[in-house]
Amino acid sequence: MTEVRCVLAPNPGPMTLEGTNTWVLRADVASRAVVVDPGPLHEAHLDAVSAAAGEVAVVLLTHGHADHSAGAEVFAERHGCSVRALDPAHRLGSEGLGDGDVVAVDGLEVCVVATPGHTADSLSFVVAAERAVLTGDTVLGRGTAVVAHPDGHLGAYLDSLRRLRDLAESAQVERIWPGHGPAIESALPVIEGYLAHRAERLDQVREAVASGATTPRAVVERVYADVDPVLWPAAEQSVAAQLVYLSGWG
């Protein structure tokens, strides 16, 4: 059994939903915890994570976006532990993270799965004992993830979704613990929905381009007309990634 706690950061918004989920994991009755995505540099939030975690063995980052990583160094220094991430710029200590790595702490095992696409450095973490995967921003608790050009790469993202789907189809993963939004108890239909949504959006972008839309903004005005305009700048970056993909470069 694994003790699992989610500490919600006070950073709600259109892109972060209710806020960033910081996950605290430990093997049942173990003394040391693994903390995934300490979140923003917000003192009260880091205090809440510390209270939930107790002794911390290591901090893991799903990716380097500030809403997940900005508080990591301060938090890790407070607990005297390392920060492990794919991108060396976000590490504290000499150990990184890569596909296939297993982080083992006092009976808890966290398996690293490379899931690039939302960002080049995106990772997911499988907790096999719970048949769960922590997905960061690759799959959210509600809505869909943004794949924003230039760091976002749609081809890689689709491959990552297929890899997560394979884990769900093989019953290695049944639930999703996301970086934002509520936990998902049935992973497979959500991942399949993400893939279907991306295919539908790509068809819509193709149609918009065929009908004369020549810029990301023009495509957004046609394809994302039902989306709150406050999200259009992010949608433009997403469309840019889709156009790169459709051009054969992404």
Task: Give the ranges of each region predicted by the language model.
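Conserved beta-strand hairpin/beta-sheet module of binuclear metal-dependent hydrolase folds
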Residues: 1-52, 124-136, 141
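Surface-exposed cleft-lining segments at the edges of enzyme active sites
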Residues: 143-151
